[in-house]
């Protein structure tokens, strides 16, 4: 399971011109689900996302996690993160989970995150437009 996290000052996601998820300060989490991923991996990734120290403390060091910084999560499904780009000029998506399995884990990840922090989401498998104001920019690829 892959989480590409970006520290943001604000972010939103639109489907058919309508905002379906929006946060101010926090993390935009682009979530990719691979074959073989399960709830255990989702739990590990969520703990990493929640506890990764990417926000500045009073001394300006990245010492605070998203909860300590008073932030939120915007979780957006991103199946292309699981792409195999090793060969040729066209990505292969054979490593990605099936749509049904990916949706189940995406929903699980969101439900578990919402137990700990204010969480907004995109719409699974929709054509989405994601807008964000990067803070830094600070971007990390987390994989479990």
Curated annotation (Swiss-Prot):
Q: Which domain of life is it from?
A: Bacteria
Print the domain comment field. A Gly-cisPro motif from one monomer fits into the active site of the other monomer to allow specific chiral rejection of L-amino acids.
Q: Which reaction does it catalyse?
A: glycyl-tRNA(Ala) + H2O = tRNA(Ala) + glycine + H(+); a D-aminoacyl-tRNA + H2O = a tRNA + a D-alpha-amino acid + H(+)
The primary site where this protein sits is cytoplasm
Its BP terms in the Gene Ontology are: D-amino acid catabolic process
One Gene Ontology cellular component annotation held by this UniProt entry: cytoplasm
Q: What class of enzyme is it?
A: hydrolase
Q: What is its EC number?
A: 3.1.1.96
Q: Where in the cell is it found?
A: Cytoplasm
UniProt protein name: D-aminoacyl-tRNA deacylase
Q: Could you tell me the gene encoding this protein?
A: dtd
Q: Name one Pfam family in it.
A: Tyr_Deacylase
Q: Where is this motif: Gly-cisPro motif, important for rejection of L-amino acids?
A: 136-137
Subunit architecture? Homodimer.
Q: What does this protein do?
A: An aminoacyl-tRNA editing enzyme that deacylates mischarged D-aminoacyl-tRNAs. Also deacylates mischarged glycyl-tRNA(Ala), protecting cells against glycine mischarging by AlaRS. Acts via tRNA-based rather than protein-based catalysis; rejects L-amino acids rather than detecting D-amino acids in the active site. By recycling D-aminoacyl-tRNA to D-amino acids and free tRNA molecules, this enzyme counteracts the toxicity associated with the formation of D-aminoacyl-tRNA entities in vivo and helps enforce protein L-homochirality.
**InterPro entries of this UniProt entry?**
Daa-tRNA_deacyls_DTD, DTD-like_sf
The family classification in the record reads: Belongs to the DTD family.
The alphabetical list of record keywords is: Cytoplasm, Hydrolase, RNA-binding, tRNA-binding
Q: Which NCBIfam families match?
A: D-aminoacyl-tRNA deacylase
Cite a single GO MF annotation: tRNA binding
């Amino acid at each position: 399971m892959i989480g590409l996290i970006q520290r943001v000052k604000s972010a939103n996601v639109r489907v058919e011109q309508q905002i379906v998820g929006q946060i101010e300060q926090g993390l935009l989490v682009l979530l990719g689900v691979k074959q073989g991923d399960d709830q255990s991996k989702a739990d590990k990734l969520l703990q990493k996302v929640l506890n990764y120290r990417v926000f500045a403390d009073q001394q300006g060091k990245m010492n605070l996690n998203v909860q300590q910084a008073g932030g939120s999560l915007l979780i957006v499904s991103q199946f292309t993160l699981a792409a195999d780009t090793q060969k040729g000029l066209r990505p292969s998506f054979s490593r990605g989970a099936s749509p049904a399995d990916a949706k189940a884990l995406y929903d699980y990840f969101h439900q578990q995150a919402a137990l700990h922090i204010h969480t907004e989401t995109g719409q699974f498998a929709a054509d989405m437009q994601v807008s964000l104001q990067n803070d830094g920019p600070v971007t990390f690829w987390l994989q479990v």
